[in-house]
Amino acid sequence: MNYLVMISLALLLMTGVESVRDGYIVDSKNCVYHCVPPCDGLCKKNGAKSGSCGFLIPSGLACWCVALPDNVPIKDPSYKCHSR
């Protein structure tokens, strides 16, 4: 009986759960992607369920992704965009 519990626990830990979140998708410099090309394609290409154009102060129009995987960076308001 104990073996069954241990095996079940091990399988549960090995499968892992991939979590998702919503947010403004960014590049490696914490700069948002603007709405051209259309956001839905960009977001889906990066594993999100969907994407749309939203307004982010002070960046302006930016791509908002729904259900984006954790390994894809989203806008961190505590860091500025470091372009160029």
Curated annotation (Swiss-Prot):
It comes from the Eukaryota. Belongs to the long (4 C-C) scorpion toxin superfamily. Sodium channel inhibitor family. Alpha subfamily. Its main location: secreted. Residues 1-19 form the signal peptide. Residues 84 form a propeptide. GO terms for cellular component: extracellular region. Keywords: Disulfide bond, Ion channel impairing toxin, Neurotoxin, Secreted, Signal, Toxin, Voltage-gated sodium channel impairing toxin. PROSITE patterns: LCN_CSAB (PS51863). GO terms for molecular function: sodium channel inhibitor activity; toxin activity. GO terms for biological process: defense response. Residues 21-82 form the LCN-type CS-alpha/beta domain. It is found in: Secreted. Has the structural arrangement of an alpha-helix connected to antiparallel beta-sheets by disulfide bonds (CS-alpha/beta). This is Alpha-mammal toxin Aah3. It holds the Pfam family Toxin_3.
